[in-house]
Amino acid sequence: MMLDVAPPRFRVEEEDERHGIFVAEPLPRGLGHTLGNALRRVMLSGLPGAAVTKLRIEGVQHEFSTIEGVREDVVDIILNVKQLKFRLERDEPIELQISKDGPGEVRGSDIELKADVEVVNPDAYIASLSEGGHLDMTLTVERGQGYVPAEQNKSDADPIGVIAVDSLFSPVEKVQYRVSETRAGARVDLDALTLEVFTDGRLGPREALREASRKLIDFFGLFAEGYQGAGAAEEPGRSGGRPVITDERPIEDLELTVRSYNCLKREGVDTIGQLATMTEEELMNIRNLGMKSVDEIRSKLEEYGYTLESGRE
């Protein structure tokens, strides 16, 4: 299909920290929609980011509480906290503190930061304190991808007063694409694909497009002849024992919940191949990884043709 088409060109029409317009042309007719839709979907739901997953406020037992000297009730504070955007350069969860006395407003800039973490929107409003008011709050920030409801962020190990919140990890706010006609030489039936990407500042638009492209390349590699990234192979001369699985795809491709993903990363489990060689008992021995998470991992592995006990079926 590509033999009689000039090599496609990529160009940047507009770009700043949060917005970019990118064009690829000429493409064979129909391929513009194929690529545009795939890239759009991956950018919106398949890229990792960092967000608040839990919070704890001194003196508060549950989310339907009020705090003396604070204008907002806890429900409103949670809604405001969910708007905070973070860059986190570590796989492990991190706890951040806010401690402020009134009168005055509490904003993202009042968060006491640690190494490897940054608040992208420090002007984000959290609460207002009156004279004598005080807010002492701990935020748990984790990496993940897509949208994770509060229920999945809960843990039986959480002490009383820890409130799980909905987390929107995706750094991409909106993606639009359009396909127009273009020409190359005598050919006039070709596609020009224009992608417009809006991010929230945690990731630049060109970087978002690049990361989405890499993810798609990894998945399309499954169907390419001679692809070596997936499948199980037994070591030469080895009989019995645990199989060696050479699936180098990252565990991010499994789209696990935040808890399962972070527990595995802390244990150094980075690829699907590593995970597929593990047993249920080994997973249960990982700190904070309960039976619910093990069941989730088993289900995800089965979608890829693996079992916990014996690797590829």
UniProtKB/Swiss-Prot annotation:
<dbReference type="GO" id="GO:0003677">
    <property type="term" value="F:DNA binding"/>
</dbReference>
<comment type="subunit">
    <text>Homodimer. The RNAP catalytic core consists of 2 alpha, 1 beta, 1 beta' and 1 omega subunit. When a sigma factor is associated with the core the holoenzyme is formed, which can initiate transcription.</text>
</comment>
<dbReference type="GO" id="GO:0003899">
    <property type="term" value="F:DNA-directed RNA polymerase activity"/>
</dbReference>
<keyword id="KW-0548">Nucleotidyltransferase</keyword>
<keyword id="KW-0804">Transcription</keyword>
<dbReference type="GO" id="GO:0006351">
    <property type="term" value="P:DNA-templated transcription"/>
</dbReference>
<dbReference type="Pfam" id="PF01000">
    <property type="entry name" value="RNA_pol_A_bac"/>
</dbReference>
<dbReference type="GO" id="GO:0000428">
    <property type="term" value="C:DNA-directed RNA polymerase complex"/>
</dbReference>
<dbReference type="InterPro" id="IPR011260">
    <property type="entry name" value="RNAP_asu_C"/>
</dbReference>
<protein>
    <recommendedName>
        <fullName>DNA-directed RNA polymerase subunit alpha</fullName>
        <ecNumber>2.7.7.6</ecNumber>
    </recommendedName>
</protein>
<feature type="region of interest" description="Alpha N-terminal domain (alpha-NTD)">
    <location>
        <begin position="1"/>
        <end position="227"/>
    </location>
</feature>
<dbReference type="InterPro" id="IPR036643">
    <property type="entry name" value="RNApol_insert_sf"/>
</dbReference>
<comment type="similarity">
    <text>Belongs to the RNA polymerase alpha chain family.</text>
</comment>
<dbReference type="InterPro" id="IPR011262">
    <property type="entry name" value="DNA-dir_RNA_pol_insert"/>
</dbReference>
<keyword id="KW-0240">DNA-directed RNA polymerase</keyword>
<feature type="region of interest" description="Alpha C-terminal domain (alpha-CTD)">
    <location>
        <begin position="242"/>
        <end position="313"/>
    </location>
</feature>
<dbReference type="GO" id="GO:0005737">
    <property type="term" value="C:cytoplasm"/>
</dbReference>
<dbReference type="Pfam" id="PF01193">
    <property type="entry name" value="RNA_pol_L"/>
</dbReference>
<dbReference type="InterPro" id="IPR011263">
    <property type="entry name" value="DNA-dir_RNA_pol_RpoA/D/Rpb3"/>
</dbReference>
<dbReference type="GO" id="GO:0046983">
    <property type="term" value="F:protein dimerization activity"/>
</dbReference>
<dbReference type="Pfam" id="PF03118">
    <property type="entry name" value="RNA_pol_A_CTD"/>
</dbReference>
<keyword id="KW-0808">Transferase</keyword>
<comment type="function">
    <text>DNA-dependent RNA polymerase catalyzes the transcription of DNA into RNA using the four ribonucleoside triphosphates as substrates.</text>
</comment>
<dbReference type="InterPro" id="IPR036603">
    <property type="entry name" value="RBP11-like"/>
</dbReference>
<dbReference type="InterPro" id="IPR011773">
    <property type="entry name" value="DNA-dir_RpoA"/>
</dbReference>
